Curated annotation (Swiss-Prot):
Compartments where found: Cytoplasm
HAMAP family referenced in this protein's UniProt entry, alphabetically: PdxJ
Task performed by this protein: Catalyzes the complicated ring closure reaction between the two acyclic compounds 1-deoxy-D-xylulose-5-phosphate (DXP) and 3-amino-2-oxopropyl phosphate (1-amino-acetone-3-phosphate or AAP) to form pyridoxine 5'-phosphate (PNP) and inorganic phosphate.
Name of the protein in its database record: Pyridoxine 5'-phosphate synthase
GO biological process, one term: pyridoxine biosynthetic process
Originating gene: pdxJ
Organism of this sequence: Desulfatibacillum aliphaticivorans
Length: 235
């Protein structure tokens, strides 16, 4: 039975499209929690394309479950995290030209800087997750760097729905749990593809945003969150 953390970035995307102050992702965070979600996720990107600094600060003050801050491992973002103190920081790679995060963090390549970021955040009382591709070398590197959690990038599977991509996720999840890390999963998961994860018991929590916000346009945020939460609980 997996948990569900809901990403409200795309509520902010809609707001920023018109440069107005609505819809407010802060209000969305409240509704997400009232619907029963296990946490709220926001990605404060360096270019501030959707979530803004004030969103992070206000959501941190009002959230009753947990706030997960997705962020690049830059001095600026680490400083903000230490000030805001989210319940969890998820380190992700970032490219300004990408529409959304395109791949996992290369912990093997950047092991020293990632380990330093993890140490700094943990010293501030923040649990640290690394968003990584389902690759065994990345899992081993994440563990060696000191991560508390790995969030497995599920984008390849959600695009292809291939048995090979699912097998990679299962293998990575098993290894991560074996070495003592929590296992989360996210990216590209919708109301159909989440059902393919039934039986992957190593996954403890899903991080999902776009598909929930998209469904909410038609049936409302409360109903969309509850529908996805029911599916996550079956995993």
């Amino acid at each position: 039975m997996a948990g569900l953390a809901v990403n409200v970035d795309h509520v902010a995307t809609l707001r920023q499209a018109r440069g107005v102050d609505y819809p407010d992702p802060v209000a969305a965070a409240v509704l997400v929690e009232l619907a029963g979600a296990d946490g709220v996720v926001v990605h404060l990107r360096e270019d501030r394309r959707h979530i803004q600094d004030r969103d992070v600060r206000i959501i941190r003050q009002i959230v009753q479950s947990k706030l997960i801050l997705e962020m690049a491992a830059t001095p600026e973002m680490i400083g903000i995290a230490l000030e805001v103190r989210p319940h969890q920081a998820t380190l992700v790679p970032e490219k300004r030209e990408e529409v959304t995060t395109e791949g996992g963090l290369d912990v093997v390549m950047h092991k020293d800087s990632v380990a330093d970021a993890i140490k700094t955040l943990q010293a501030g009382g923040i649990k640290v997750s690394l968003f990584v591709d389902p690759d065994l070398n990345q899992i081993k590197a994440a563990h060696k760097a000191g991560a508390d959690v790995v969030e497995l990038h599920t984008g390849d599977f959600c695009e292809s729905r291939s048995p090979k991509a699912m097998a990679a996720i299962q293998e990575a999840a098993r290894l991560a749990r074996k070495v003592g890390m929590e296992v989360h999963a996210g990216h590209g998961i919708d109301f159909r593809s989440i059902q393919d994860f039934v039986g992957v018991k190593e996954i403890q929590e899903f991080s999902i945003g776009h598909s929930i916000v998209s469904r909410a346009v038609f049936i409302g945020l409360d109903a969309a969150v509850k529908e996805m939460m029911a599916l996550a609980r079956q995993v």
